[in-house]
Amino acid sequence: MPEKINNWEGGAAPLGFSWRPAVDPTGHPIYKIHAGPFADKISRTLKDVAILLVSQQYNLIIDDVAFGILEVGEWKQALKDYPVLYVGVTTPLDILEKRERLRGNRFVGGARGQYFKVHENVAYDLEIDTHAQSLEENIEKIKQAFSERENSKQV
């Protein structure tokens, strides 16, 4: 997406992605992501590309920040004819905010804004916690879930 379409510094971007100030359920100031019509089109196109690739027998890992049950539902509908393992990636809010600050290239307040929306009413096949477990432990959990799914198909 051309950079001029987006504004990640807090200004307006009516066509693309941008941050908008808001307040979270606990009263803290946050930034919510806003998607304009071009950003929405890109998001829909990502699903179309995923369908094309899986229909051609490609295995995919799709890393998408889907905002709650509606957006996850769009993915589930798009990929309903294919085997999918939906993994929710979580971490405590204080750790998420610390990571946001340490990265240095994030709009502070965006992580808190996403925290309260991303997993809202979403049921995953597997959840992993990137703070409570190591990368290696989470990889093993995902591999185990895939293995169990494959074994259940053979029964």
Where are these regions (language model features)?
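Small-molecule kinase domains that catalyze NTP-dependent phosphoryl transfer to phosphate-bearing small molecules
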Residues: 93, 98-155
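Conserved substrate/cofactor phosphate-moiety recognition/catalytic segment
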Residues: 1-41
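Short hydrophobic/aromatic-rich motifs at helix boundaries and adjacent loops
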Residues: 19-23, 43-48, 66, 86-87, ...
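ATP-dependent NMP and nucleoside kinases share a basic, alpha-helical "lid"
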Residues: 50, 54-105, 111
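A generic structural signal for secondary-structure junctions
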Residues: 2-10, 80, 101-105, 147
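Amphipathic alpha-helical transducer elements in NTP-driven molecular machines
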Residues: 36-47, 90-93, 136-139
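Active-site-proximal flexible loops/turns
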Residues: 1-5, 70-71, 136
